[in-house]
């Protein structure tokens, strides 16, 4: 996937480029990848209700009601994984189309079977989610990497500090450090969202959305 981004900013540019009195969403990689994964049948935990939530978010971003921000690491991770997911979507879609056409061939009404076979060609949820994620990236500010992010993330990883507790997870730490650095620089007065689909790393446990207390203490007052 060719990802178009035009809003790349350094931390020092944050006060000039972003509004402190407007809400923003800061994306974790898995949250964006899961949008593309929604049509995959084997991902039973991803539902069409989730697609509606992403549609709502995209609309809020496009209307200028919510600022969209991601770390440079998130962009890199997303780019590394998304093409494989898209290939899975296309393969699954073709299998479904072939199966439906095969089933309709046994229908008594040949004309009706032909109509259904033609309509199935327009059932393309895969293209819908791909278009949506492209639009999100087009409207997203990319927070460029810098040495302080890397140094902090390395320290957290080596000392197993959340979100690297119990494992070496440099990228998760880097993304979190980027988010906290952004908050400290912008000093927002409106609500801010850290959107992750990986609560096992950032929440109390994988069954809750409550921020891990180690991370909660780092949030600006």
Identify what each model region corresponds to.
Residues 2-192, 200-221:
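Active-site-proximal, substrate-binding regions of enzyme catalytic domains
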Residues 197:
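Cofactor-binding loop segments of dinucleotide-utilizing enzymes, especially the Rossmann-like FAD-
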């Amino acid at each position: 996937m060719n990802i178009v981004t035009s809003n790349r900013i350094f931390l020092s540019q944050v006060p000039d480029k972003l509004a402190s009195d407007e809400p923003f969403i800061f994306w974790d990689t898995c949250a964006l990848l899961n949008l593309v994964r929604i049509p995959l049948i084997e991902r039973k935990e991803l539902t069409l209700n989730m697609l509606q939530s992403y549609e709502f978010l995209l609309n809020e971003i496009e209307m200028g009601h919510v600022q969209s921000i991601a770390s440079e690491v998130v962009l890199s991770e997303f780019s590394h994984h998304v093409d494989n997911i898209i290939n899975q979507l296309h393969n699954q879609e073709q299998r479904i189309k072939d199966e439906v056409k095969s089933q309709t061939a046994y229908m008594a009404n040949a004309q009706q079977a032909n109509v259904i076979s033609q309509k199935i060609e327009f059932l393309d949820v895969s293209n819908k989610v791909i278009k949506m994620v492209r639009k999100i990236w087009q409207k997203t500010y990319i927070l460029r990497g810098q040495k302080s992010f890397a140094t902090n993330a390395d320290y957290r990883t080596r000392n197993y500090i959340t979100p690297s507790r119990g494992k070496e997870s440099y990228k998760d730490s880097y993304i979190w450090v980027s988010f906290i650095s952004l908050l400290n620089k912008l000093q927002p007065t409106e609500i801010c969202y850290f959107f992750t689909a990986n609560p096992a790393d950032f929440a109390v446990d994988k069954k809750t959305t409550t921020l891990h207390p180690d991370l909660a203490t780092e949030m600006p007052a």
